[in-house]
Amino acid sequence: MNMHAKGRLVGVGTGPGDPELLTLKAVRALAEADVVAHFSKRGSNGNARAIVGAHLRPVCIELPLVYPVTTEIDKDHNDYRSAIADFYEESVHKVAEHLEAGRMVAVLSEGDPLFYGSYMHLHVRLADRFPTEVIPGVTAMSGCWSQAGLPIVQGDDVLSVLPGTMSEFELTRRLADTDAAVIMKVGRNLPKIRRALEATGKLARAVYVERGTMANTASMPLADKADDDAPYFSIVLVAGWVGRP
């Protein structure tokens, strides 16, 4: 098939949650898309779909990509890995069918598509077969530190982005070796994160933000947060810029 007869794959960053933080380029891509694909868990259209809802054309085809599992199985369990691997292969096939038919497919991704985004799993499998574009989005971490009014780094400060899912030993080691940190994937890992921050002397300057930039957002010093599970959309920030003009 002629390459020019094929459709175009576009990864669209939808930003951290506030629809007003969508970029002009993202809005334009949504206005042009024949198909809009969005990842979600069972029983939900997903947050990315909610962010862009006002910009979807009535005639566009919606393609939900529904995760078979989320947090009910440990991510290191073989059953989880197998189910997710099969899911991404099936998702690639569904998207490729539309691309082969000559359609423009916009795949939504909260924050930025290439930063902890599920879109990446499609990108690496399809970018060598179809014309592809990635539209960057405002990341969740920048949305959260802007909302909190928290200067995060300056000068030679080192910023580490850490998943809360890593082991407590590794999390503590990396926190000890950085000036500033963003801890993502908080959820049920909050008690472990708190212990690691306390062990490294950083708990007092840690800020907890949930649902950053969204309508029902909340932020507070992490030391004041109850030690229960945090929502999926939550982040812990540790500023490196402390006590400096």
Residue spans of the language-model regions?
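Short, acidic/turn-prone active-site loops that include or flank metal/cofactor-
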Residues: 16-17, 41-43, 67-68, 138-140, ...
